[in-house]
């Protein structure tokens, strides 16, 4: 193992964030002791806790700390405590979204995997998921309807509101390229999601993706309307490999993936820019209703660390070791409350972190 020193900015945030980050620290500790992983970590405030301590959800200190790091390991932000704030000052928008914008993190990568040994976790029938699920959702993260012109007019007899979806070809092109590159290392199959029978932005999306496909002749491309895709994902999830989506459609599809495998607590995610710098976080939110109860599922946080090692630090072996340890833990039925079939028999947050750490240590 190389002795190169890696730097990770750790942003625990709010809610369950600090709890599940602690379990990721256990994994890093094993990597340091057993695999000679040389890393320096530094924690920074973000979100609600940053508002409470510094008056803003994202401080210059946090931004600079992230700039001086190789990657960001992120917990979660938000909670009812800050709901009274104006929209632009809330932890999510003023913290996480601002951070994504600052680093131009345009590509969201969210794996969705459920092995044949764990079919009982999924709410779907075994006959539907008997082959297991192994897909990855690639979502454009900085364009589309969430960033287009919008307004709400209420001081008239018939109030109205509007949102505008805008996509530049360059935005579509760069996310499509990442999807095709990832597909090349998998089953060489992409399903691109759009609504090209209705939306002009989707027509441009489809045309751009088609043009990108010419550069990757060994990858099979299929287009699917969003309404049909949501249905097919339930009917035959094992037929999907790489799913390419706009911001809005990716928001929908990626959460459907969480439902299919049984818990959003199992889904990690990566948000990358063109240089490979990334922010890695669980797909779920801050879950303030369970914060402090030691029942949060830390697996998504641990798998987010695995993605960080793979995509930003380019250490695929260490990433694979973590993935295998998590898989073994689930096969052994080490489960948190959200995925346990027996509500009286489950492991606490710290307990499953210990189990996964022990399994990882045995791989050294």
From Swiss-Prot:
InterPro entries: IsoCit/isopropylmalate_DH_CS, IsoPropMal-DH-like_dom, Isopropylmalate_DH. The keyword Membrane does not apply. NAD(+) binds at residues 79-92, 285-297. GO terms for cellular component: cytosol. One of its GO terms (biological process) is L-leucine biosynthetic process. The record marks 146, 195 as: Important for catalysis. One of its GO terms (molecular function) is magnesium ion binding. Keywords: Amino-acid biosynthesis, Branched-chain amino acid biosynthesis, Cytoplasm, Leucine biosynthesis, Magnesium, Manganese, Metal-binding, NAD, Oxidoreductase, Plasmid. Coiled coil: none annotated. SMART domains: Iso_dh. It is an enzyme of class 1 (oxidoreductase). Belongs to the isocitrate and isopropylmalate dehydrogenases family. LeuB type 1 subfamily. This is 3-isopropylmalate dehydrogenase.
